[in-house]
Amino acid sequence: MSDAAAYQADGRSVSRAAFYTIACDPRRSVVVEACAGAGKTWMLVSRIVRALLDGAQPNEILAITFTRKAAGEMRERLDEWLREFAAPGLPHERLVEALQERGVPAQQAETLAPHLAGLHERILDAGRGVEIRTFHCLLYTSPSPRD
């Protein structure tokens, strides 16, 4: 199967790179339909990273998924990536590559690479991280406090 057959945006076939440029852009609203193992977790966590790089505060992000397992995988992936990107001695080129994989244009990736390296520390300093929950968290919300 070619990239063009596997990825669609706005009803037309696009390359993998074009798809991730669109899908990982936090300024866009997207719907992703894909089978298990197709990379939805990668894409959703990439959107979170991109939103943080665009200036969103960690406590302003709420990711909702269907299962505890998926929520746990998303939390683990985000933590793993942030630690990896903050690792001392990680080459600047690797940070640029990671950003480009997530749809950031080359010139912008060069500029954002140092910010990506500092993202883990920024989240720790914020005190409250990104909320990644299951949709069940919405069911336990009460319209008013109990007496």
Q: Predicted regions span which residues?
A:
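A short, hydrophobic C-terminal helix/tail in secreted or cell-surface proteins
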Residues: 143-147
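P-loop NTPase Walker
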Residues: 2-142
